[in-house]
Amino acid sequence: TKPENCEKIIQIKPDFIINTSAITDVDYCEKFKEQSYLVNVTGTKNLVKICKKLECKLIQISTDGIFNGKEENYKEDDEPKPVNYYGKTKLESENEVKNLNDYLILRTNLLYGYISKNTLASRSTYLKRTNFFMWVLTELQQNNSLKIVNDQFSNPTLVDNLKKIIFDSLKKNLVGTFHSTDITCISRFSFAKEIAKKFGFPEHLITEISSKELDQYAPRPTKTCLDCSKIQKNGINLHTLDESLDSLFKVIQKEDPKLIS
């Protein structure tokens, strides 16, 4: 969003740019629309200008949040119908990226992964937010009970898997829009139960509630599971939730064993 930063990118002359920058807090976007637009849309517009000037590829990380959640297993060409301001900004940023000849839009959802205490301590206040997986695991480790919604479905995606998807897609020189998630469609409640089971915590600490009981500020789509068959047909390997949790278990067992029961 700052011209001086754009100039620095131009001086580097990259072969490609990966745009992971976004305000993703749905309620925050609904409350602070001007700032959210600046980061999510204006920032993307600036990167598009840079890529046009340098003739380099732009990889845009997008979201399931552009859909309204009323259909099953969304494909790339299904009509976007965002139900909140966050989704609207991400859709507008996608449309900006499509003005380029060489672009890659990767739609993902519910990104999660392990974040060490040292990493969290070094972050700014906003970035101290963790992710659904870390929140659930930390609460269970402290023997706290959790109320989790049972009517919001998506494909939880391990961030390390998305990283590999990005670079595999670059190697194959993919162009266009692709759904890029882990392949298990699951509710938040069931996801939390799977975390408890994998890491050895009592599942009875987790009880289910409906989204209405949360009284969230911004509306949420209910079921935004993505069909990833297009990217799989292009030779990109995807993972199940069980495979991803197994991978995380090994990492945490080595890095932070206190998080395992």
What label would you give each PLM region?
Residues 60-73, 85-88, 111-115, 129:
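Conserved catalytic-site region of short-chain dehydrogenase/reductase
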Residues 149, 165, 172-217, 223, ...:
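Mid/C-terminal beta-alpha module of Rossmann-like enzyme folds, strongest
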